[in-house]
């Protein structure tokens, strides 16, 4: 063979892969196959609501239920059926083609004059609030790095000593949500019995009982301009949402609703005040979230955008953005000033059940029934971190500020309350005390409150 001519492909020596490379290749193939299967299942858009699961089974000509079959088993049966149809080449969405077409079609509805005024007010408010936030961030950035590192390390060591310090029966039914007041001296709870209570956070004594809901309370938020609990106050104090399809506004001096906001066609999930105190947002299983004027009770906006019910909703600290999370496993971030959806959060594989904005204004934490917490970065418009937070559904997630330090608190159906370092997503402390699943958590400084299916409210601190 002439050296200048080189060699042909047929003359190349072939050698078998080593055992290590072969094993790695097989593991890679298995991983990609698993991811492909997850993507296939996600693309099927299997409904979560049992009524829709039954409807899909009926359209497939299958029994809508078997003896002893619960909702989860019924959904798994539908999932397997839809996968089989997909593998056979059938389009599983053909059973609901009309609904699919409606989902894909964009529609625009002219807003009211009141909504236009509200958007302008929100724009002006958010610009001023952003200036204050950036000023605070600059002040923190001027602190020497060693001092911040030492402060963070000291705070983590302090939180690692947190223990169960008090427990109280919160009602006759499971306690779905707890939230600290703006100064931390009190907290409020909402139960499946429809009761809303305010408690002293020092001794866990009940100080007020509100009655107005006829079904499970699942959303609760303190009025941002209410700095301290005053039993004689005529000022707006709380907002709650419940499975009776209503949102209620409360003042401390009255045990019945100050205002009842009606309009949702299905159960209401989370509710959140706008930081300005002028507006309230509510999420519902009617697949919409709504914007309300808290002074007049007028519905300013009914926003669609999810294919399944919406449970979680949260306002960004500046007040310019709102995030919503649905049973369709999709989250969306909306610009309240323009009404546009500016980011889609599509990395969860099961429904999103809670959301919390970081005080920095550009990070959002979402928790899901897929057992994870995900941190999203709006600056990069992408997912920043995934925390395998619990071994079961992550029922709540909250950002907690303690001086210049920030932490994340989560609760899960595995019975745990956990604290996390948001800088590296490392676990700081896992606290166990509830007999059954933990349904909610909140924190103020170094104090944490949790509520559970066991009907108890528990207080934790170092």
Curated annotation (Swiss-Prot):
Gene3D superfamilies: Pre-mRNA processing factor 4 domain, YVTN repeat-like/Quinoprotein amine dehydrogenase. One of its GO terms (molecular function) is U4 snRNA binding. It comes from the Eukaryota. InterPro entries: G-protein_beta_WD-40_rep, PRP4-like, PRP4-like_sf, WD40/YVTN_repeat-like_dom_sf, WD40_repeat_CS, WD40_repeat_dom_sf, WD40_rpt. GO terms for cellular component: cytosol; U4/U6 x U5 tri-snRNP complex. CDD domains: WD40 (cd00200). This is Uncharacterized WD repeat-containing protein C227.12. It comes from Schizosaccharomyces pombe (strain 972 / ATCC 24843).
């Amino acid at each position: 063979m002439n050296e200048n001519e080189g060699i042909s492909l047929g003359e190349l020596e072939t050698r078998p892969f080593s055992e290590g490379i072969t094993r790695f290749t097989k593991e890679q193939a298995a991983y990609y196959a698993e991811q492909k299967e997850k993507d296939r299942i996600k693309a099927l858009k299997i409904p979560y609501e049992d009524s829709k699961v039954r409807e899909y089974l009926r359209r497939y000509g299958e029994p809508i239920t078997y003896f002893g079959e619960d909702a989860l088993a019924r959904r798994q049966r539908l999932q397997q059926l839809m996968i089989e149809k997909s593998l056979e080449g059938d389009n599983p969405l053909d059973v609901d083609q009309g609904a699919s077409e409606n989902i894909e079609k964009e529609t625009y509805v002219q807003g009211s004059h009141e909504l236009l005024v509200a958007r302008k007010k929100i724009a002006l408010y958010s610009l001023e609030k952003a200036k204050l936030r950036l000023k605070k961030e600059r002040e923190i950035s001027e602190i020497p790095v060693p001092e911040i590192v030492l402060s963070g390390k000291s705070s983590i060591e302090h939180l690692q000593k947190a223990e169960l310090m008090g427990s109280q029966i919160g009602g006759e039914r499971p306690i779905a949500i707890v939230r600290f007041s703006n100064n931390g001296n009190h907290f409020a709870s909402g139960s499946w019995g429809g009761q809303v209570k305010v408690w002293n956070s020092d001794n866990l004594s009940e100080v007020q009982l509100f009655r107005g809901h006829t079904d499970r309370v699942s959303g609760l938020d303190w009025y941002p301009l209410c700095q301290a609990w005053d039993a004689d106050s005529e000022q707006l104090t709380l907002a709650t949402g419940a499975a009776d399809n209503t949102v209620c506004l409360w003042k401390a001096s009255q045990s019945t609703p100050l205002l009842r906001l009606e309009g949702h066609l299905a159960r209401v999930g989370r509710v959140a005040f706008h930081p300005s105190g002028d507006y309230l947002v509510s999420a519902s299983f009617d697949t919409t979230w709504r914007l309300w004027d808290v002074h007049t009770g007028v519905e300013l906006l009914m926003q669609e955008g999810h294919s399944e019910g919406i449970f979680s909703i949260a306002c960004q600290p500046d007040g310019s953005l709102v995030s919503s999370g649905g049973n369709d496993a999709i989250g969306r971030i909306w610009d309240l000033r323009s009404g546009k959806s500016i980011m889609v959060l599509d990395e969860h594989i099961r429904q999103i059940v809670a959301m919390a904005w970081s005080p920095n204004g550009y990070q959002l934490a979402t928790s899901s029934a897929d057992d994870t917490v995900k941190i999203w970065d709006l600056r990069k418009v992408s997912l920043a971190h995934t925390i395998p937070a619990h071994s079961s559904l992550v029922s709540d997630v909250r950002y907690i500020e303690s001086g210049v330090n920030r932490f994340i608190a989560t609760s899960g159906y595995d019975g745990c309350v956990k604290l996390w370092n948001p800088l590296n997503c490392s676990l700081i402390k896992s606290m166990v005390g509830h007999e059954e699943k933990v349904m909610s958590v909140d924190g103020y400084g170094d104090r944490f409150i949790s509520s559970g299916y066991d009907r108890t409210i528990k207080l934790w601190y170092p």
